[in-house]
Amino acid sequence: KWTIQIKTAAAISPLRLSLELQNINCRIMDIKREGNNKWSYSIDTSNSYVYKAEDLTGNSQLNLKKPTKPYIIRVSNISKINISSNVGNNWYPNIVFYDKDFNTIEVVEKDSLHKNLKISVPNNTNYIKIDDFYSLGNIKQGLNITKE
């Protein structure tokens, strides 16, 4: 169970919230009024996914542009990936593997500069977060990810 508290000047439109949640395969199951200014929503997230995650499930390679935040990659049934940095990048890999419920499976941190990295993907991985240990500026030219 999650609790999210939002303070707004106006009430949130249940229809608009429902439409936004549909974008990530979530559904509002129930709405309860708990006071003049308090509502409780029951939301089914069993088929949800991370919004705007890069998709490596249907592709063999991703060419990722300059990041504004760590990359989130959606994967399934892969055993290895090769991450290569574009010209001008040297980075300190910080990679986190997550299961379908976003529980951490494994964390890989490298305290040395890399241009290329071949890494095994743990079983049951559904998402991978790829970051630089120190600064996203180290991967400002982007990364290429290939599944093997």
Regions inferred by a protein language model and the residue ranges of each:
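Noncatalytic modules at the cell exterior or secretory-pathway interfaces
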Residues: W2-T3, A11-I28, N36-Y41, N77-N82, ...
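Non-catalytic extracellular/lumenal accessory regions of secreted precursors
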Residues: I28-K66
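Non-catalytic, beta-strand-enriched accessory regions in extracellular/secretory proteins
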Residues: N59-S76, N116-K118
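Non-cytosolic beta-sheet module surface loops
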Residues: V75, S84-G88
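Short, surface-exposed beta-strand/strand-loop-strand elements in extracellular ectodomains
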Residues: N89-T104
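Solvent-exposed serine/threonine-rich low-complexity stretches and specific carbohydrate-binding patches
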Residues: E106-L113
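C-terminal interaction-tip segments
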Residues: I145-E148
